[in-house]
């Protein structure tokens, strides 16, 4: 082989080498793009499956048989428990009338459906407030009678004797009359019933004494339990 032929072969080899290198690089680039595309599709598919089956993302509320969301129901239960625990230590009283005495209104706490709790006290027929605060005060009485020989006015009053100014004042009061002023003929023989309910929210002080009274206790109806009562609830 001549020197010129060897030189030409070397030159041809040098010219072919970049072409081969370019082809190799192009093949490698295509392989990388294919691999990246595969990983992207696989990742998107995996993410879709995780979201679809609820493994990640917003959790679905499981349902009770009645259709209520489990998570919402649990939250409501915890809220109710918390509210119950917070209110369980508040003063409360509910007293009922003594039906064994006549022509007077005497309150009792040692009876069914009656209670004194968390500092409330019943003393001298009055409920004693154990702490400053807002209180719901309520009372109900039921009057009954036979006929209307005379014009009758029935009053029911809830009063407060305040420790701060040592004076008894009315908190709640109502007046009713079962008989009209002009009594119709035959009304003397008919029975009548008059309920009076009082209730309101008041700012009270520790030591305040609350009383619930009527002007004509002889007309009170004690025939059924739950008709005459008096209560205080701290808010």
Curated annotation (Swiss-Prot):
Annotated glycosylation sites: 83, 86
Identify residues that carry Phosphoserine.
2
Listed Pfam families: TNF
Q: Which residues lie on this side of the membrane: Cytoplasmic?
A: 1-35
Question: What Gene Ontology terms for biological process does this UniProt record contain?
Answer: animal organ morphogenesis; antiviral innate immune response; apoptotic signaling pathway; cellular extravasation; cellular response to amino acid stimulus; cellular response to ionizing radiation; cellular response to lipopolysaccharide; cellular response to nicotine
The compartments listed are: Cell membrane
Q: Which InterPro entries match?
A: TNF, TNF_alpha, TNF_CS, TNF_dom, Tumour_necrosis_fac-like_dom
Task: Give the Extracellular compartment stretches of this protein.
Answer: 57-235
Q: Could you tell me what this protein does?
A: Cytokine that binds to TNFRSF1A/TNFR1 and TNFRSF1B/TNFBR. It is mainly secreted by macrophages and can induce cell death of certain tumor cell lines. It is potent pyrogen causing fever by direct action or by stimulation of interleukin-1 secretion and is implicated in the induction of cachexia, Under certain conditions it can stimulate cell proliferation and induce cell differentiation. Induces insulin resistance in adipocytes via inhibition of insulin-induced IRS1 tyrosine phosphorylation and insulin-induced glucose uptake. The TNF intracellular domain (ICD) form induces IL12 production in dendritic cells.
| Protein name, per record | Tumor necrosis factor
Q: Which organism is it from?
A: Mus musculus
């Amino acid at each position: 082989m001549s020197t010129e032929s060897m030189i030409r072969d070397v030159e041809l080899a040098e010219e072919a080498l970049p072409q081969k290198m370019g082809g190799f690089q192009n093949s490698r680039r295509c392989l990388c793009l294919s691999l990246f595309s595969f990983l992207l599709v696989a990742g998107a598919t995996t993410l879709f499956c995780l979201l679809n089956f609820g493994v990640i993302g917003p959790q679905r509320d499981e349902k009770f048989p009645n259709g209520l969301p489990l998570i919402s129901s649990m939250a409501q239960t915890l809220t109710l428990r918390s509210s119950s625990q917070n209110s369980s230590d508040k003063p409360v009283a509910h007293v009922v009338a003594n039906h064994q005495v006549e022509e007077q209104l005497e309150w009792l706490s040692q009876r069914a459906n009656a209670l004194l709790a968390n500092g409330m006290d019943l003393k001298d027929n009055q409920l004693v407030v154990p702490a400053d605060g807002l209180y719901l005060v309520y009372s109900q009485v039921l009057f009954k009678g036979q006929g209307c020989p005379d014009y009758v006015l029935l009053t029911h009053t809830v009063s407060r004797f305040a420790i701060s100014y040592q004076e008894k004042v009315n908190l709640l009061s109502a007046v009713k009359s079962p008989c009209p002023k002009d009594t119709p003929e035959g009304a003397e023989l008919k029975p009548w019933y008059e309920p009076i309910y009082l209730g309101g929210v008041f700012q009270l002080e520790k030591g305040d004494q609350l009383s619930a009274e009527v002007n004509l206790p002889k007309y009170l109806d004690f025939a059924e339990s739950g008709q005459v009562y008096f209560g205080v609830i701290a808010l």
